[in-house]
């Protein structure tokens, strides 16, 4: 069985690679985390092949789990929980009741509406709709002796598809990640493509396995070791060059953030520090997108949060640094003192531009806004 993880860098063309590596005459299943990812994949497939290959299916991971791992085995699921006549009514994106809620004084208390994982109500609401948030957890939970939903479903998937490809794998956490690993042990050919350093960037789904454990953050080398333990080969070469960022930008990111990324020869761009004499021109230039750590809507100019810029490409960007990062250009500055999640968000922000990246210190911006 062929199982591979392709580790990429920002702007390397992950989706481009996925869509161009497939054999359109083979039966391919391409999965991604968000509908935006799916939209990008469909557009890339059109560019690569002129149309969506007839034998290629594209869907979100949640849709895949529901359609291939739950619906065909609903009678088995119903019997497992004592509901042999179960007929469900789709899925809901509303989250199930949490185990603990805040009391009158703000203290955590038990939620009377919470159901444990051995109860069917943990996975389905009163309208017989499956909770989207617990789909993978449900599939992992259903076992009878050595038999499991995963084994049965994987056998069917191997019949339907020659290759399974998962784009932006760094977006998957906890039960979704566990399900992917469990399926990989049964599915004949699976390829995962993603950027380790773009994990924990989104506002949601940013904790837990495989990037966090009881000891805290799982580093790059430890992550690679864990993936190899699961039977995957790792390709750290194919997508190590950014098609977006210049050599100068990538060199600075590598040197200051400790993230290995190679630039291209086509685009030209530099890191440019903005001081009190030049800040007005940069802030007032609407063609230069401003990227801020958070609360973009509170700034008196059009801005975008670092994390929300993930996946975007701009001609030029202006990254406004936090106080913690003001001295990043100093030789004595150590990125190791900064939280990994913050480093990842800064990495995303600094790799959005095809041209120049302007850097503004928080103190310089504060003075400008107080004028």
Where are these regions (language model features)?
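The feature marks helicase ATPase cores and/or their adjacent C-terminal helical subdomains
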Residues: 1-371
């Amino acid at each position: 069985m062929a199982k591979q993880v392709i580790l990429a860098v920002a702007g390397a063309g992950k989706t481009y690679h996925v869509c161009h590596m497939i054999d359109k005459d083979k039966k391919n299943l391409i999965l991604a985390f968000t509908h935006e990812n799916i939209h990008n994949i469909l557009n890339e497939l059109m560019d690569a092949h002129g149309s969506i290959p007839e034998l290629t299916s594209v869907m979100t991971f949640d849709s895949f789990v529901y359609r291939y791992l739950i619906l065909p085995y609903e009678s088995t699921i119903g019997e497992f929980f004592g509901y042999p006549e179960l007929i469900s009514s789709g899925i809901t994106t509303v989250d199930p009741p949490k185990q603990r809620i805040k009391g009158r004084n703000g203290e955590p208390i038990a939620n009377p509406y919470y159901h444990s994982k051995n109860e069917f109500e943990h996975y389905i609401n009163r309208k017989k709709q499956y909770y989207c948030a617990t789909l993978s957890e449900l599939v992992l939970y259903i076992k009878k002796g050595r038999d499991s939903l995963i084994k049965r479903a994987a056998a069917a998937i191997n019949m339907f598809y020659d290759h399974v490809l998962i784009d932006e794998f760094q977006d998957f956490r906890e039960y979704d990640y566990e399900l992917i690993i469990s399926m990989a042990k049964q599915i004949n050919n699976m390829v995962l493509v993603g950027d380790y350093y773009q994990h924990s960037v989104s506002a949601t789904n940013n904790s837990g396995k495989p990037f966090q454990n009881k000891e805290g953050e799982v580093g790059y080398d430890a992550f690679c070791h864990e993936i190899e333990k699961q039977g995957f080969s790792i390709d750290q070469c194919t997508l190590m060059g950014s098609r977006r960022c210049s050599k100068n930008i990538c060199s600075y990111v590598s040197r200051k953030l400790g993230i290995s990324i190679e630039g291209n020869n086509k685009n030209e761009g530099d890191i440019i520090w903005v001081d009190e004499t030049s800040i007005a021109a940069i802030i007032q230039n609407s063609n230069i997108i401003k990227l801020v750590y958070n609360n973009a809507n509170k700034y008196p100019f059009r801005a975008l949060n670092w994390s929300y810029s993930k996946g975007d490409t701009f001609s030029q960007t202006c990254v406004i640094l936090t106080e913690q990062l003001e001295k990043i250009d100093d030789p004595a500055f150590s990125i190791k003192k900064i939280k990994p999640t913050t480093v990842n968000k800064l990495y995303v922000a600094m790799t959005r531009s095809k041209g120049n990246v302007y850097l503004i210190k928080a103190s310089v911006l504060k003075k400008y806004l107080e004028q």
